[in-house]
């Protein structure tokens, strides 16, 4: 049986890294995408190849059309097909709305939302003829309810959810599933600057009484890819009950 292939944007660190590890260890060909974190990507690549797993790595700023296209072309050149696309690349720059510069707004929207359009559009050139595929967009609970001091981030993640729902309706007849995962507070670099007291408060406000781990989101992604054949257009809220 041929291996399936998963392309994961922004997969050198955090949630993307955990997804890459889990998919590679579950018999997928995996393409690790990075932009600035080359050392982290190489470290992950070396770890997985030493385990005898099928992985590649490719540098691309997916907020740029040409680089997004190059990433997809590379993946097809290596593995001939893309069965699972996970749009994970994202940035967050918390600040008051009145302090958001035009440059920051454009950077956040381009990285978090435009990249999803660019990569997905190119990948569909290969998924549509096969009438098969899973697209999983990593959004955020702030895309559902909005986050104070994260208006640009919240807008980008809400846009991902709208894209997910609309695209699922378009692609359903072609047997392509499109879903989103909306993580809560996850132990990644995005929260590394929060104080210990703030982290304890967030933990206390989460009914499951813990901060999420990247592996929690990776398990959701693998479930959707492996067992989610009758799930499409949905938002899986993996947030420990923080948002209900």
Regions found by a protein language model. Give the residues of each.
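Residue(s) in the substrate-gating loop at a strand-loop-helix junction
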Residues: 140
């Amino acid at each position: 049986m041929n291996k399936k292939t998963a392309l994961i944007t922004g997969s050198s660190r955090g949630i993307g890294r955990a997804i890459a590890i889990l998919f590679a260890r579950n018999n997928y060909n995996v393409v690790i995408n990075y932009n600035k974190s080359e050392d982290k990507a190489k470290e992950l690549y070396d770890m997985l190849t030493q385990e005898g797993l099928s992985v590649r790595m490719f540098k691309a700023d997916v907020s740029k059309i040409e680089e997004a296209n190059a990433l997809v072309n590379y993946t097809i050149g290596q593995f001939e097909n893309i069965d699972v696309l996970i749009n994970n690349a994202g940035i967050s720059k918390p600040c008051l709305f009145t302090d958001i510069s035009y440059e920051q707004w454009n950077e956040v929207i381009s990285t978090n939302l435009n990249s999803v359009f660019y990569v997905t559009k190119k990948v569909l050139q290969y998924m549509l003829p096969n009438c098969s595929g899973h697209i999983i967009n990593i959004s955020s609970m702030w895309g559902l309810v909005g986050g104070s001091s994260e208006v640009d981030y919240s807008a980008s993640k809400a846009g991902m959810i709208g894209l997910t729902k609309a695209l699922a309706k378009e692609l359903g007849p072609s047997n392509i599933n499109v879903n989103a995962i909306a993580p809560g507070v996850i132990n990644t670099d995005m929260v590394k600057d929060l104080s210990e007291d703030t982290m304890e408060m967030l933990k206390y406000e989460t009914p499951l009484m813990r901060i999420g781990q990247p592996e929690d989101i990776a398990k959701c992604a693998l479930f959707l890819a492996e067992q989610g054949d009758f799930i499409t257009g949905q938002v899986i809220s993996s947030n420990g009950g923080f948002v209900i």
